[in-house]
Curated annotation (Swiss-Prot):
It comes from Exiguobacterium sp. (strain ATCC BAA-1283 / AT1b). Signal peptide: none annotated. NCBIfam families: hisT_truA. One of its GO terms (biological process) is tRNA pseudouridine synthesis. It is an enzyme of class 5 (isomerase). Belongs to the tRNA pseudouridine synthase TruA family. SUPFAM superfamilies: Pseudouridine synthase. This is tRNA pseudouridine synthase A.
Amino acid sequence: MRRIKLIVAYDGTHYAGYQVQPNGNTIQAEIESVLARMHRHPVKIIASGRTDARVHALGQVIHFDTTLEMPAERFVKALNAMLPDDILVKQAEEMDDTFHARYGAKRKEYRYHIRQTEDPFRRHYAATVTYKLSLEAMRQAMERLIGTHDFTSFSVTKAEVEDRVRTIYEAEVLEMGDEIIFRFVGSGFLYNQVRIMVGTVIEVGRGKYQPADITQMLEAKDRRVAGITAPPHGLYLWNVNYEKVD
């Protein structure tokens, strides 16, 4: 058996998320369906993490085991020929059998895009926020999220994890053209954590909270004290890094 690593991009607009579900089409189901046709038997894929309905990815990482003898790079063309147009395999590489897309990940980067003007052609790819925002206040708020913290206040109550301590290495607000982008690099993220952090920072930007309130929210460990959950369609899984972090 050989282990193949894929880097995959997808437009999550028309999917019920990454993970296979009994109702609704998913990214995992589409890729596994194509691999099953290629292998003539079911093939299970493992991803670096799950993305929700309408969430996008530029650098999702997946692995699977195969008995096919074709060179790893040929999987790119073979898969893309059969996958729908909103899923693209960008790269394929043969790995050692110790590689694991989920458990081997050291850092993940997420980006969240917002626009301050309505645009019907980009409505699925950036959230629209029409009120005035203070970039300086939002940047100060983002700085307070950097470090190792218990992010209970920034995760959903139903999250099935006992340890909610995560490390954020980088958190910044970028301006790119007519969009504002919230960029996070961390050791890992709780369910809905990025969307809740973004929703809260946006509310800092509009004056509902002060940047210093972020520290109090972290200390409270209570979801009710943080801000809203930003909608899913502005969120992108940007990159997954497997190199050891110093």
